[in-house]
Amino acid sequence: MTIPALRVTHCPVNTAGVPWQNVQALRRKGVDARLVVFERYKLHPEADESLDRRGGLARQQATQWRALARLLPRTDIFHFYFGLTLVPKSLQFPILRAARKKSVMHFLGSDIRGKPSAELAWAAKAGARIVGSYDAIRWVPEAEVVPPGINLSEYTPVPPSDRERPVVVHAPSSRRRKGTEHVIAACEQLPVSLEIVEGLHHDDARRRYERADIVVDQLNAGWYGLFAIEAMAVGKPVVSFLHDEAVARTEEAFGVRVPIVSATADTLVERLRPLVESAEERRRVGAESRAYIERVHDADRLADRLLDIYSRL
């Protein structure tokens, strides 16, 4: 499915690299897509253009308004992320409507988690709302689900090893939110080597978890993130806390079993133990994980979902 004439500006952040993956996949479909960000993130600096805002609020706003004026004639659809717009929301959506431009608001998790519906009501001004999982949809029930996508050609499976002391990798963006203290405590009770990966550029972090035998994502949020997605893409078994309802809805929507081993802080040791004790089990779950990613998180498949949403704006 291609729409060669469609011009889509994704903005204004590259949170977790999700916007950049979407832009790249849309380009492979023949779409004129670009990513414009306020600033480049240290861990995910990819973007076609950074506004590199300087100075105080007034100067930053002036930079953003100039960017909007420049992008309006070049854009059919503005695809916003993380609850942010180029200019204040109270003006952004009326301007787009007046200019006959379409818009999408794409939430990425922490921007909506736990917020009351009244606080998110403004998102109805966008032509469509997107969330990344059937867990996040409880915060924005009218949203469409488009999971984060990755370019599978960049991920070669590296099956877990058969070493007697498996390497467990945990990469917390926030130790408190990811439950890192419980991961450390659990690994101290098992014959494993724990490696905590923090503050590395995305490519460097990838090289670290490609050496993992087991990956622990998070124990609090109720769904998995990009770290888990990339780990599964290279054939690693992943342990993470998942909400049962979100698992059921995901399996129904995509027709595939979610292979992640669900655990809480209290059950982490017992859930890790079979993976620690059996290299065969690690490889089995790892292979199932790669197959799941091919079905659910292939960026090219997900670009088709985005194009379908765009066509209905």
Q: Model-flagged regions — what are they?
A:
Residues 277-310:
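A charged, aromatic-enriched C-terminal amphipathic alpha-helix characteristic of glycosyltransferases
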Residues 237-246:
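Short hydrophobic beta-strand element within catalytic cores of glycosyltransferases
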Residues 112, 124-157:
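Donor nucleotide-sugar binding/catalytic pocket of nucleotide-sugar-dependent glycosyltransferases
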Residues 77-82, 93-113, 128-131:
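Active-site proximal beta-strand in glycosyltransferases
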Residues 8, 157-178, 184-188:
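Conserved donor-binding/catalytic core segment of Leloir-type glycosyltransferases
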Residues 76, 210-223, 236:
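Acidic donor-binding loop of glycosyltransferase active sites
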